[in-house]
């Protein structure tokens, strides 16, 4: 029994070392934004490449999350609906609500230097 426990402990230790030494194998952190009172919060979100951003509509009426360049576009999100998009390329992504075009915000994607 001790031999089996020893193998399990060794395996877990190896896994931990692999995760620590190979940060590119670890997924980029996810980020969240909300839609409330005709506003995207935060208005400017900075993330690393590989990050998935999830927007949640906390307003009482539908909204969309639409990239100015049409790179991403949600359907109309009712209250508590979500939309997610993974940003793989560094850059600045301006977006708006297609139902209320004065609602605007930006996602800034920085290079994920840990992945190199």
Q: Where does each model-flagged region fall?
A:
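Extracytoplasmic copper-binding redox domains, predominantly the cupredoxin/blue-copper superfamily
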Residues: 2-9, 15-16, 23-116
């Amino acid at each position: 029994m001790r031999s089996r426990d020893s193998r399990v402990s060794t395996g877990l230790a190896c896994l931990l070392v692999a995760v620590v030494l190979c940060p590119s194998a670890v997924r980029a952190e996810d980020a969240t934004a909300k839609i409330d009172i005709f506003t995207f919060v935060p208005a400017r979100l900075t993330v690393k490449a590989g990050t998935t951003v999830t927007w949640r509509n906390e307003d009482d009426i539908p909204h969309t999350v639409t990239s100015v360049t049409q790179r991403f576009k949600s359907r109309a999100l009712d209250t508590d609906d979500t939309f997610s998009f993974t940003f793989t390329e560094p850059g600045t992504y301006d977006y708006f609500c297609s139902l209320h075009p004065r609602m605007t915000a930006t996602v800034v994607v920085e290079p994920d230097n840990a992945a190199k």
